[in-house]
């Protein structure tokens, strides 16, 4: 597309050079800029990418969007605008033909449950033999093809490109985890959502948002906007077991469907049966009750299942077909995942990294603990430490607790474990500044019949170390190797 057409609907402060330039690609990453690229510079929290503009010109880029005129050598056009990231969103949606308008788009937000709900929606579509895409913590997936991702919600240009990829793959639907960071930073500008889903709101990310009020406001942006096309039929799915749903219902102009277990809602789960093999419940709806069976473990996953089913149903899919699909779903990797049931211990990994998430995790596994519950939890570096002692307190619901760092980054691992230990309510705990050593210790002290839970990371494949270097790390592989060495069996046996 010619740059003059690309900027036709955008008011700019100044243009230095000509807009008669062919633009084939838009990027905010200077490393990927090349001939035919339009580079958008921005002043971030830690880096001002305006300083890379000369680099992109040297790489062949002929046009840059900046918030001030720069001294650049070479044949380059500068487009000066007040808010470069807002313009980046507008340009990306224009160049890539407004991809979110071309499929059914689901947005899932909440402190806990985003990955599970979003993955369930994606898998329901696949079980119904429909092309589908997923974007979130576990990366980007079109049908069964997966690629890794850096953030839950990518920056605006990368996000638009992913939606375009889904459209090009003939996806009928795309489900996105929508983070509070992504909403607050405007990464979702221009995305047209058809259904917005809320799981819950508990303390997290206050290192970024500052207050729970600001955190909640960021979440609410998804429900008050859902895009700019007010003529489309759109829906909001809210968890009535969380009080914040009342506020979200008040700020959205769209039809609301509520679900719940403990609080009255339009859709409810009753007569619940739980085991480490899954859940069964009666799904009570405004138009009848339906038995549901799923391999997902834990009462909190019943809430996630209901949210996913309602979201897909709201866009016209038959509920019986959805329920049949749910019965066949594979559990979400790293979310209350039981590793190798043939082991004489129950070895479980989970992503729970907040006090609320840990409480729900322990609630889910405790009824099935035969002997001791050994619980390992980590605290991330450079994060909100005010939540840390409460995490330590919740962890002490277990018989034996292991405190470790989780992505310590530039923080002292010993400081992180000490913060967790401040909340300890008994003395049956130990601190390790090396998470892998903590995992091996958990297996070493476990006896047949014990349950070992490795919390905080799920299947995250790295530890973020000093200098923000990512070092390969897998809780599941470390735990399984230690278990096979102790109890025998398994492909990881030495």
Swiss-Prot record:
Top enzyme category: ligase
GO biological process, one term: peptidoglycan biosynthetic process
InterPro entries noted in UniProt: Mur-like_cat_sf (IPR036565), Mur_ligase_C (IPR004101), Mur_ligase_C_dom_sf (IPR036615), Mur_ligase_cen (IPR013221), Mur_ligase_N (IPR000713), MurE/MurF_N (IPR035911), UDP-N-AcMur-Glu-dNH2Pim_ligase (IPR005761)
Keyword list, A-Z: ATP-binding, Cell cycle, Cell division, Cell shape, Cell wall biogenesis/degradation, Cytoplasm, Ligase, Nucleotide-binding, Peptidoglycan synthesis
Highest taxon above the source species: Bacteria
Enzyme Commission number(s) from the entry: 6.3.2.7
Described purpose of this protein according to its UniProt entry: Catalyzes the addition of L-lysine to the nucleotide precursor UDP-N-acetylmuramoyl-L-alanyl-D-glutamate (UMAG) in the biosynthesis of bacterial cell-wall peptidoglycan.
Protein name (record): UDP-N-acetylmuramoyl-L-alanyl-D-glutamate--L-lysine ligase
Annotated source species: Staphylococcus epidermidis (strain ATCC 35984 / DSM 28319 / BCRC 17069 / CCUG 31568 / BM 3577 / RP62A)
Lineage: Bacteria, Bacillati, Bacillota, Bacilli, Bacillales
Gene that this polypeptide is encoded by: murE
């Amino acid at each position: 597309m010619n740059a003059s057409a690309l900027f036709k609907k955008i008011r700019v402060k100044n243009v230095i050079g000509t807009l008669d330039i062919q633009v084939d690609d838009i990027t905010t990453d200077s490393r990927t800029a090349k001939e035919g690229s339009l580079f958008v510079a921005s002043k971030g929290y830690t880096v001002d990418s305006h300083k890379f503009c000369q680099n992109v010109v040297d790489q062949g880029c002929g046009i840059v969007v900046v918030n001030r005129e720069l001294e650049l050598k070479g044949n380059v056009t500068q487009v000066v605008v007040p808010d470069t990231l807002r313009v980046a969103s507008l340009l990306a949606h224009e160049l890539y033909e407004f991809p979110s308008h071309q499929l059914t788009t689901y947005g899932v937000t909440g402190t806990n449950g985003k990955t599970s709900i979003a993955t369930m929606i994606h898998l329901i579509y696949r079980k119904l033999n429909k092309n589908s895409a997923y974007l979130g913590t576990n990366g980007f997936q079109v049908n069964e093809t997966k690629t890794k991702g850096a953030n839950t919600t990518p920056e605006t240009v990368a996000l638009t490109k992913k939606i375009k990829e889904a459209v090009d793959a003939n996806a009928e639907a795309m489900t996105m985890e929508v983070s509070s960071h992504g909403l607050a930073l405007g990464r979702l500008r221009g995305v047209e959502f058809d259904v917005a889903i809320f799981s819950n709101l508990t303390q997290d990310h206050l290192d970024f948002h500052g207050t729970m009020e600001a955190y909640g406001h960021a979440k609410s942006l998804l429900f008050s906007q859902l895009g700019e096309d007010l003529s489309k039929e759109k829906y909001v799915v809210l968890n009535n077991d969380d009080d914040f749903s009342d506020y979200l219902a008040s700020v959205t102009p769209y039809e609301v469907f509520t679900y719940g277990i403990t609080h009255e809602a339009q859709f409810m789960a009753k007569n619940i049966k739980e085991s480490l093999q899954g859940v069964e419940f009666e799904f009570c709806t405004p138009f009848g009750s339906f038995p549901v069976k799923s391999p997902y473990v834990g009462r909190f996953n019943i809430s996630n299942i209901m949210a996913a089913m309602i979201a897909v149903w709201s866009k016209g899919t038959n509920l019986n077909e959805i329920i049949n699909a749910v019965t066949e779903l594979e559990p979400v990797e790293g979310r209350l995942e039981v590793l190798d049931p043939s082991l004489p211990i129950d070895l479980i990994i989970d992503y729970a990294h907040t006090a609320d998430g840990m409480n729900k995790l322990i609630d889910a596994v405790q009824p099935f603990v035969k002997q001791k519950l050994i619980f390992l939890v980590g605290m991330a570096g450079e994060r909100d430490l005010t939540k840390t002692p409460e995490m330590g307190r919740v962890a002490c619901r277990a018989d034996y607790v292991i405190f470790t760092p989780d992505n310590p980054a530039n923080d002292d691992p010993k400081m992180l474990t000490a913060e967790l230990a401040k909340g300890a309510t008994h003395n049956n705990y130990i601190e390790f500044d090396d998470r892998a050593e903590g995992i091996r210790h958990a297996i070493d002290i476990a006896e047949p019949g014990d349950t070992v839970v490795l919390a905080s990371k799920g299947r995250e494949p790295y530890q973020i170390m000093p200098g923000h270097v990512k070092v390969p790390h897998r809780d599941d592989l470390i735990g399984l190797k230690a278990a096979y060495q102790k109890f025998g069996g398994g492909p990881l046996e030495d």
